[in-house]
Amino acid sequence: MMDRDSFLQKYAGHLNEKQLAAVQTVNGPVLLLAVPGSGKTTVLVTRLGYMLYCEGIRPENILTLTYTVAATKDMARRFREIFGEEYSNALEFRTINGICARVIARYGQMIGKSAFELLTDEKVILRMLTEILVQNLS
């Protein structure tokens, strides 16, 4: 654990007043609306650090969702660069699709079903769609 003032001095000295408020808001949602390059990811990463190091929230109790794989990788990389390895591997950085796939896979395990496979081969997808169309149009 780290006291609030030490954390803010070490990791958040470059943030403005509204960004600091977002970092320190732990209970409830925080909405960050700003133009690209304004520091949204920096605020989120700093907020994660604040939750872990100042509030004592366990990394297993934090889920960070993004829309794209690139954003997920960027956020995880930035967290690791700023805060090191201590919590990096325990935090969940996922896309919305990624967390949904994980929930489905875990549910499948719970009921004794094997995990599904994501089809990415376009030829296989086209063949399956053709079979479905033929079956349903006959």
Predicted features by range, described:
Residues 88-90, 109-138:
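ATP-hydrolysis module of ASCE/P-loop NTPase motor domains
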Residues 1-111:
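P-loop NTPase Walker
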